[in-house]
């Protein structure tokens, strides 16, 4: 269990060389990167050191979408689109589609929690109920912007946006205590309620265990598995968990 994405933000007036070096360092983590960058030249330099890992370039808006589209298309990466409101987001997304780019994600983050929630729900509703394909892309919700510094609030909002249509959720940090309920919640969202939550029977090596490691066993009920495996991983002892 780990953070699957790393968001690397490029603030206004950031130094291109420093940002590129930070992106290169983040790429070494082996996680998918999301580059929050609105400057086409800086974005191009950053993508040069990480494009093979297929990052997301989150930086297109009404003022720069043509240049950002050219950068993203050349690198073959997903382009994130934002707008000052839903109308601008829609128009910019439609303009990118006319340029032939449908490899997009929508940044639905607003000025505050209320606006962000409304944006995210309305975008998904337009795609599903109104069959509007222009809003039929995954969404990014940046909790750092709407709850900066409040880690507990970010964790609470992450649970809400997991259920209410956030495809990529950006937080300042992810501790084990925050990750466990959030990952369990995400798993439940994509679980068939008519089927019991079970773990596939098999042998699960923990902490670098090999064939000579200690063997322990537990039942296949998913909640039990996650509780037991979490405790065993924290012990640091190499062992094989048999389900």
Model-derived regions: residue spans:
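Conserved mixed alpha/beta catalytic, RNA-binding, or beta-rich assembly cores of soluble enzyme
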Residues: 1-94, 99-243
């Amino acid at each position: 269990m780990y953070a699957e994405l790393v968001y690397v933000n490029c603030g206004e007036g950031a130094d291109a060389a420093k940002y590129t070096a930070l992106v290169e360092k983040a790429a070494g983590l082996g996680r998918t990167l999301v580059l929050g960058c609105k400057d086409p030249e800086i974005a191009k330099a950053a993508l040069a050191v990480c494009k093979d890992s297929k990052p997301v370039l989150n930086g297109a808006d009404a003022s720069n979408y043509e240049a950002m589209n050219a950068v993203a298309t050349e690198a073959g990466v997903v382009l994130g689109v934002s707008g000052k409101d839903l109308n601008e987001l829609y128009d910019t997304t439609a303009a990118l589609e006319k340029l032939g780019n449908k490899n997009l994600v929508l940044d639905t983050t607003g000025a505050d929690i209320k606006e962000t929630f409304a944006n995210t729900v309305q975008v998904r509703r337009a795609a599903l109920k109104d069959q509007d394909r222009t809003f039929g892309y995954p969404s990014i919700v940046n909790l750092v912007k709407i709850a900066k510094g409040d880690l507990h609030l970010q964790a609470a909002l992450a649970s809400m946006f997991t259920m209410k249509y956030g495809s990529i959720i950006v937080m300042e940090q992810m501790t084990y205590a925050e990750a466990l309920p959030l990952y369990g919640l995400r798993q439940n969202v994509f679980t068939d309620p008519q089927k019991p939550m079970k773990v596939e029977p098999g042998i699960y090596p923990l902490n670098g265990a090999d064939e000579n490691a200690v063997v322990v066993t537990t039942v296949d009920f998913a909640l039990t598995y996650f509780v037991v495996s979490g405790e065993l991983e924290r012990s640091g002892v190499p062992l094989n968990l048999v389900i």
